[in-house]
Amino acid sequence: TCGSNKALYGTVRVAEADCYDQPGDKALTEIVKEVEAEAAEWREYVRKKEKWDKLQRLLRDPGVDLDAIPPELMDGLDNLDRPPQSKYGHAPRLALLVDDCQGTKLFTTGSNNTFGHLCIKHRHVGEGLGLSVFILCQNFASPGACNRFIRQNATHLMLFRERDEEVMDKVAAEASGVHWSREEFLAAHRYAVSQGQHDF
């Protein structure tokens, strides 16, 4: 999908190295390692920034003897004149976009499903840095499509126009609940897909 949708993904600057054409455990392991590396880099930036801030407070304090400043406060700081810079200017915001993977190992059932486990613990990957997971699929609950335990952990659902009432009943049964009744969900969906130029 990454190769065939290059024109679409070009606006979000997806690097070639960030595309995985063979969905499976190996790709997921590499992705989690990348998240952990981003988290380690961010933690190192935070550590350096805290040291730099502390050093600056001491340097600005007229009551502090400069010779008494611990030298370890300067260790690892690349530039004493300006604060350390983070890679993005903020904490990394990482996302995994899974597209056209229906029928692959990602959506197998069973307790050994690595992708299912990642979807459930995505907020805790990278020591809490997290990884948002976006799943694009054409079938809500067909065999080989998005597993029920993944759907039950979803926080958002973008649902396009669907004319098959059985499918809509299934979606409504899973998506309604505390905040919506089945009827309210179906009415909201009918309203949403009938408005404007978008049918979702």
Label each residue range with its predicted role.
Residues 1-9, 14, 22-32, 49-50, ...:
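Conserved P-loop NTPase motor cores
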Residues 38-52:
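Long amphipathic alpha-helices with heptad-repeat character
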Residues 179-200:
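Conserved AAA+ ATPase small/helical "lid" subdomain
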